[in-house]
């Protein structure tokens, strides 16, 4: 059921007051894809009275006051994305459209929404209940961080928002514990997965360089970020604190990851999977076209790409739902009156991480000295695609389901490492679960740029492309990489797709026979990337990939990512050496234009 958004709904529920009021920068969509809805439904399922105020008018009290004041706390989120990312392009132009706003116009979410909403509440409720910040905007800005839009180091968002608590990461457990302890009159400052402000430093926590120090010294900023990044795994992380003037930001160790059973329970909650009627009157919400008939199979990501925030926010450990949980949800989708038989996506951050576990990580936490997929797939990971193969086969058997597409994209290096199931997974995918285009994200081909991104070298892409085309077009595999300059070929992975897999895929080619294509995603102007690198990519794309790429984005330095650290410091954190960083907006655009244009200039 929908959570109430108006006084009329409270009256209908015979509620005089709410325990928790959640405020968000997106339209209210009751869906498991929307973080504030998940938090709301988790709290409601635990017996708390929860309401939602979506995209309140920041120039009056009409919206922010319409549900009154909560008994326990206010929860504040900027929405599914950082509000500055949602509102501006990588070249700092205002975005005109918004997929998460009714009507599609980007005119309802303020810049720095978390700070604005928190101060809006303080304006109209002077001595109110605790303000709890959450969501990706708060999570990635919880310590001193580089802010691309102001080109400055900003202090923890807790200080600017004048809030009481911040919950970081996927915060169901922490938020529920806050509600329970506030209800019972208990202290909340010992809860894992939260940050708060203290007049004194805690004992036995690691001290980060002070805010004032990291503003003045890039080496201190790098030291701060490295320590912060290495203390995010629930099994190994220590508590942290950072001085901001006379006060201290305190970060408690993270909450344990949800178990698969706990994740199943969340997706079994009573989501309506639609826009709340109050917001439907304001127009269509474009995001519904994608999320309404899609399935999330897992959380977390093994990739740890330097430009991406998923590993920090969702975790570097993949937690997969049970097949039964996913099938149950798919059966619910099939019963919806507007379901046409097509599940638009079955996946997560990367579709083919479902069901793949690292036993070491489950018991000892994420490694401090290496990554799961970079520079090669770790031997401890033991990729096994059999769980997803079985899941996809089960989805096809559901009454009313015509197709279940895998649109999230896949990691071809992870597939390459699964010698036992590589062939059968590709056959399953191509024959039944690709809508015409399969997404992959090599991001670049220049060796140095890929290294700074934390992405695999290009040989894995070439191997994968050959096999995909052999299946779908009957092309002969190419034994040589044509059109690749020495810098691109240098340090390429020497791993090959297993020969047994290649033979099997060739055998299945005629039975599949579908005309399908690979869609490639690339990034321009990442730290370390030059115009010459983009010309190299342009040449490679035309000669080897046989495409003129259109899916190209200019790099945006997201708060609390290693790529953002490189952008600010102009230093490679792995070597300590200075790197080239393009910061001129016109030249960033030129890097993109080089590859999307029809000629190399």
State where each predicted segment sits:
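Intrinsic disorder/low-complexity segments
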Residues: 201-203, 476-512
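Conserved, mostly hydrophobic/aromatic
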Residues: 164, 266, 301, 326, ...
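Flexible glycine/acidic-rich beta-alpha junction loops that bind and position SAM and/or redox cofactors
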Residues: 82-91, 140-142, 172-177, 202, ...
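Conserved SAM/AdoMet-binding glycine-rich loop
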Residues: 22, 38, 57-58, 332-476, ...
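Terminal amphipathic helices with adjacent charged low-complexity linkers/tails
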Residues: 59, 188-220, 225-232, 246, ...
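N-terminal pre-triad scaffold of radical SAM enzymes
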Residues: 23-28, 282-309, 340-342
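Glycine-rich beta-alpha loop elements in corrinoid/cobalamin-binding modules
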Residues: 35, 54-244, 249-252, 256, ...
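Radical SAM enzyme core and accessory elements
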Residues: 2-5, 215-255, 262, 268, ...
